[in-house]
From Swiss-Prot:
Taxon lineage: Bacteria, Pseudomonadati, Pseudomonadota, Alphaproteobacteria, Rickettsiales
SUPFAM superfamilies given in the database record: Small protein B (SmpB)
Subcellular location: Cytoplasm
Gene: smpB
Pfam families named among the record's database cross-references: SmpB
Full protein name: SsrA-binding protein
C-alpha cells in the first residue's frame, strides 16, 4: 500500500485462519453501482478468496451491497469479479498456487492515493486447530503482560 489509502473493508479472520506468506496488490473490475456501494462502505470480504480460471484471476464470494439509488440497473451483490494483474504476476501466482495447501485470500479492499479501488491479496496456507490455540494463548499472554506492566508503574 502506498502513502495514502482509505481502507474500506478488512478480512480480520484471515490472519487467524491462515499463515500469510506473501502479500500483493491487485485492481478490480467494478460496475458503477458497485463503486458507489464501496464508497458508502457496504462491503464484506469475510469468506472471499481468489482463484485462477483460464489464465486470469477472479475474486469469489465477496459481497458488495446493492446501491439503492441505482434502481433497476443495480448489480448482483455476490458476483464473481475479475482482478487486474500483469501477466508475470499472474504466472507467479499460478506457480505458487500449484503448491498443495496454498490459497489466495482477500485481506482488504481500499482506495489508493489515486482514488482507485484496490484489493490486497495474501498467499496463505491454512492453520491447524493447534496453531490457532497457540495464537490465542500468545495474545492472552501479551494482554496479561501489558496489564502487569501498567500496574507496576
Amino acid at each position: 500500500m502506498e502513502n495514502y489509502c482509505k481502507i474500506v473493508a478488512q478480512n480480520r479472520k484471515a490472519k487467524f485462519n491462515y499463515f500469510i506468506e506473501d502479500k500483493m496488490e491487485a485492481g478490480i473490475v467494478l460496475q458503477g453501482s458497485e463503486l458507489k456501494s464501496i464508497r458508502s462502505g457496504k462491503v464484506s470480504i469475510e469468506d472471499s478468496y481468489a482463484a485462477e480460471s483460464s489464465n486470469e484471476i477472479f475474486l469469489y464470494n465477496s459481497y458488495i451491497g446493492e446501491y439503492k439509488q441505482a434502481n433497476r440497473f443495480n448489480h448482483v451483490p455476490r458476483r464473481v469479479r475479475k482482478l487486474l494483474l500483469h501477466r508475470k504476476e499472474i504466472q507467479k501466482i499460478i506457480g505458487k498456487l500449484s503448491v498443495q495447501g496454498c490459497t489466495l485470500v482477500a485481506l482488504s479492499i481500499y482506495f489508493n492515493s489515486k482514488n482507485k479501488v484496490k484489493v490486497e491479496l495474501g498467499l496463505a496456507k491454512g492453520k491447524k486447530q493447534y496453531d490457532k490455540r497457540y495464537a490465542i494463548k500468545e495474545q492472552e499472554w501479551k494482554k496479561q503482560q501489558a496489564r502487569i506492566m501498567r500496574n507496576k508503574f
